[in-house]
Amino acid sequence: MNILERMRAGELIFDTDPEYPSLYAEFEKTMKLVAQLNSGYHTPEEIRDLLGRIWGQPLDESVRMFPPFYTNFGKFTRVGRGVFINFGCTFLDRGGITLEDGVFIGPGVLLVTENHPEQPAVRRNVYAKPCLLYTSPSPRDS
């Protein structure tokens, strides 16, 4: 498994991992798109296009978001139909964020799926766990 697959699996990723520098290249790509998204006015279509590029998926025309929006990675966010994300949200998605159909996110929400161990000796390392948001009733409740 590569570093991204191991991260999604919840493994502790060490900062000495030979693949660790490749994460920074991905962060740089994402930060460029986020800066573009957060600069100036964009139509809803332009916002969806930029978010689709950040998240690596085409978005349904029913998805709406009010910038600014912040993320460090983006490739592990999945968004359903009818999702609304309000101003000033931050998604740290290395553990995976799934917003199922009809989810509304309020202003200033932080969805953080990654963390560092509390023990000082290994605090520079990172692990991630997934975040799932859905409306009730969800198809998962059936």
Protein language model annotation of sequence segments:
Residues 61-114:
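Glycine-rich active-site/cofactor-binding loop and its immediate structural neighborhood
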Residues 113-114, 118-121:
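Short acidic/His/Gly/Ser-rich catalytic and metal-binding motifs that mark active-site loops
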Residues 10, 21, 74, 94, ...:
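Residues at secondary-structure transition points
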Residues 1-62:
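Terminal amphipathic alpha-helical/low-complexity segments used for targeting or macromolecular assembly
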Residues 134-141:
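Conserved small/polar residues in nucleotide/adenosyl-binding loops
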Residues 123-133:
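Glycine-rich NAD(P)-binding loop of Rossmann-like domains
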